[in-house]
Design a protein with these regions (language model features):
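Conserved donor-binding loop and adjoining core beta-sheet/short helix segment
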Residues: 32-111, 130-135
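Acyltransferase donor/substrate-recognition loop-hinge adjacent to the catalytic core
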Residues: 1-10, 124-144
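Short amphipathic alpha-helix that is part of the acyltransferase structural core
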Residues: 1-29
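Short, charged/polar "capping" segments at the starts of alpha-helices
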Residues: 112-119
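Short glycine-/small-residue-rich flexible loop motifs, especially phosphate/cofactor-binding loops
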Residues: 14, 95, 120
C-alpha cells in the first residue's frame, strides 16, 4: 500500500532518497522548492519492517489553455527496479494524484541503462511507452 509523504514523514523520506543507490537530487523535496511553478508531491511504499522501500516524487504543472496538468517524476522512482510490486504500488499512488490534479500524462525517467531491457519491458507492462535511443535529450533525459 502506498502513502503520500507529509511534513511528518518528510525527514524519513529525504533520508531514504539520499541513502538509496537510485536516489537522486531531482527526487528531493529541495528540488521541488526550486520549481515554484510546479507542485511537489511524493509517494512512498513501506516494507514489512515499516521502513520506506520505494518512493516516487512527482512535479505537477498546470498546462496553459488545456486546463490539465503534466506530472513528471524526474529520475524516479527510487526503488529496486526489479521489484514489480513496489513499482506497481508507486504507480497506483501516482495515478491517484494524476486523477486529483487532472493530469493528462505521467512521465518518468529513471536512471536506467538503455541495455536494461527487463526494466523497459516492466514499464510497457504498466502501460508506459518509452522513447528509443538518444544520447542527447530526445527522450527527456539522455540514455547511455
Amino acid at each position: 500500500m502506498y502513502e503520500l509523504i507529509t511534513q511528518e514523514t518528510l525527514a524519513e523520506y529525504e533520508a531514504f532518497v539520499q541513502s538509496h543507490p537510485k536516489g537522486n537530487f531531482a527526487q528531493s523535496y529541495l528540488w521541488g522548492k526550486q520549481k515554484p511553478m510546479w507542485v511537489w508531491k511524493a509517494i512512498a511504499v513501506r516494507g514489512d519492517d515499516g521502513k520506506i522501500k520505494g518512493s516516487l516524487a512527482v512535479m505537477i504543472r498546470k498546462m496553459p489553455i488545456v486546463g490539465r496538468t503534466l506530472m513528471y517524476g524526474c529520475r524516479g522512482p527510487v526503488c529496486d527496479l526489479d521489484d514489480r510490486d513496489t513499482f506497481g504500488q508507486l504507480l497506483a499512488g501516482a495515478k491517484a494524484l494524476a486523477k486529483e490534479y487532472k493530469s493528462y500524462v505521467i512521465k518518468i525517467d529513471p536512471d536506467v541503462p538503455s541495455s536494461n531491457t527487463g526494466f523497459y519491458n516492466l514499464l510497457r507492462s504498466f502501460g508506459f511507452d518509452s522513447k528509443e535511443g538518444g544520447k542527447n535529450f530526445e527522450a527527456i533525459q539522455p540514455r547511455y
